[in-house]
Amino acid sequence: MSTREGRLKDTSIRLSEATAADFFALLKPRVMALAVFTAFVGLMVAPGAVNPVIAVIAIAAIAIGAGAAGALNMWYDADIDALMSRTSKRPVPSGRVTPGEALGFGLVLSALSVMTLGVLVGWLAASLLAFTIFFYIVIYTMWLKRSTPQNIVIGGAAGALPPVIGWAAATGAVGVESLVLFLIIFLWTPPHFWALALFKVGDYAAAGIPMMPNVAGPASTRRQILAYALLLAPVGVLPWAFGFTSGYYGIASAALGVGFIWHSWKVRAASETELKPAKALFAYSIVYLFAVFAALLADTIAMRALMSVGA
């Protein structure tokens, strides 16, 4: 019996010595935090007033759904996680949580999040959340991740949907504005993860994951990172260009985009053995996304405050 067959057959919910911290780690809290923040911004910048109780329920349900996706991802990827130094100490490959526990935990949280969002907030948002979990687990984790170097490009759609879900929770619809936010995250995802792959290329090779540096080579990956940065920077300004925000957001987003291009250019110009620029881009990319969405939120709050004063 192969490792994969053994892992997939071990779906019994048997007790382990897992702690609450181990189950919390299954949620991928850092990834969850990004999803929750972008969903929160999507909800807050949507037009119209949102009942605070509904807003809290929506964000909580989205957080639970994001955590559920993380738990299911760790269940399925336990075999390859065990082969990579970056992930070998995760709860399932380390043996602290059994595969059955991770699977059951993820499925229960998935159902809880979708039903809560549907019953208490709206079924469009719930449907989008269900699709996001399905896409991340079935399309990305089970299929794309192990089969194509475009795994992150296509699979990035799942990570880009939270602001759309937040917008739908607030309005009951999907607006052009929310699709712009989707596009920002979608274009941000490849350079973010390819930068990581450049300095973790050995890990991905050991696990047999066809990340771009392992398949196309570091030089091609560096060129593609710069290409995506050149696309991302102007797209990041679209909320202002389309009139969704004031010029203050446009200036902030443009400056952040220039920084992204600059870091990407340094990666493009670096030698194959020089990893510092890739590490710097990876760190900056996280700052970029949080800062762009924070600027969007701050700009929206400020504009509404000024409008209320002038009313």
From Swiss-Prot:
GO terms for molecular function: protoheme IX farnesyltransferase activity. It comes from the Bacteria. Keywords: Cell inner membrane, Cell membrane, Heme biosynthesis, Membrane, Transferase, Transmembrane, Transmembrane helix. The chain crosses the membrane at residues 31-51, 52-72, 97-117, 119-139, 152-172, 179-199, 225-245, 247-267, 281-301. Pathway: Porphyrin-containing compound metabolism; heme O biosynthesis; heme O from protoheme: step 1/1. It is a multi-pass membrane protein. This is Protoheme IX farnesyltransferase 1. The lineage of its organism: Bacteria, Pseudomonadati, Pseudomonadota, Alphaproteobacteria, Hyphomicrobiales.
